[in-house]
């Protein structure tokens, strides 16, 4: 789970994205990213890397964002929200409800990987922890620096699901051993 959609995504609503994916099941946005459609290729490669290091096939993974809003970057979110006559609290609440009642309900995930992990500001990790997480389960496999990695348990639809949190992969390359260690910290 990333944080929010980029300005490259802004031409398509979430509904349009779901319909497009349904109509073209063999076209992968991640694969298109590998082939350069996103400009940079390292984020898409890293999005493939993590499931593989945990024994999953990246083709079977659902990639989504915590906030259902596109913006040029995280700093411009409030401005974009105001443009749509919404508050950040409304976007956050609606996005988390959509994630719990639609995405998680339909996909029944074994594991969630959040790849923006600030706990002091808005991030995929902070939103998941705030809305679904058990803070008493928060454990770090790498507590600081470039490879900060941690995990906690989240309750979605009455299911406990481990959430593994790594730094934003467009800027930071995750360390597989810390990810696997975080999974083990959650008893998986």
PLM feature spans:
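A polyanion-binding, active-site-adjacent surface
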Residues: 1-107, 111, 115, 119-122, ...
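C-terminal capping/extension of enzyme domains
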Residues: 83-97, 120-188
């Amino acid at each position: 789970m990333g944080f929010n959609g980029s300005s490259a995504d802004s031409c398509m609503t979430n509904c349009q994205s779901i319909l497009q994916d349904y109509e073209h099941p063999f076209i992968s946005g991640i694969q298109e990213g590998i082939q350069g459609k996103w400009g940079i290729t390292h984020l898409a490669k890293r999005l493939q890397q993590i499931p593989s290091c945990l024994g999953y096939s990246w083709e079977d993974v659902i990639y989504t964002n915590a906030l259902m809003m596109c913006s040029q970057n995280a700093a411009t979110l409030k401005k974009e929200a105001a443009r749509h006559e919404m508050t950040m609290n409304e976007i956050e609440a609606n996005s988390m409800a959509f994630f719990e009642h639609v995405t998680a309900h339909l996909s029944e995930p074994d594991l969630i990987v959040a790849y923006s992990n600030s706990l002091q500001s808005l991030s995929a990790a902070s939103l998941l922890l705030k809305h679904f997480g058990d803070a008493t389960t928060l454990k770090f496999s790498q507590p600081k620096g470039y490879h900060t990695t941690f995990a906690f348990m989240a309750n979605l639809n009455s299911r406990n699901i481990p959430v593994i949190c790594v730094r934003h992969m467009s800027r930071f390359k995750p360390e597989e051993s810390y990810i696997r260690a975080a999974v083990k910290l959650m008893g998986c």
